[in-house]
Amino acid sequence: STWVLASFPIPVRSICKIMSMKAVRNNRLGSALSWSIRAKDAAFATLISDRFLREYCERGTFSDLDLIDNLGPSILLSDRLTFLGKYREFHRKYGEKKFFAAAKLLLMLMTARIAPCSFWMTLLTDALPLLEHKEVIFSADQTYELMKCLEDVMAAEPKKENLQDDDAEIMKVEMLRLALARNLARAIIKEGTLDEL
């Protein structure tokens, strides 16, 4: 298989691209991603990664978890694929109750700017349970970073001409601001207490 790929790179890649496009048309995202990785087609891998992320936003779950969990070095094919793999890793850490590691990864996804801007509000919403956790998960500095990310999201959103703003979005932003403020207060108290010891 490796010999074939090395001997005939252009025809093999073309076949892989065709198979990837066919899989997308049949709405088989896992297969499409696998073929685009074999073709080393970064642009198409990015497109498919975006489809996975849209599907996650619509359904609240990922399809083809086994593939996403085992991307290996191919995760570096495109920034969006890297984000998809790392975002899935965040969910895995959270599910395993490794909250500090999950929080650190979530913050890295936002501050490294590999997350698509359209996905930032989803990431901030994912931070809510960690911000509201009985134990302080985000430090004061990390909370300030999240606050800056929220303000960046709000500044980037176009001002709606319609007076009837999306109530759900407004509620989400207010919940985030409240959770961030509470977490900041708890983190400052905790860190101040630790400094005194």
Name these PLM-found stretches.
Residues 1-197:
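Extended alpha-helical solenoid/arm regions of large eukaryotic scaffolding proteins
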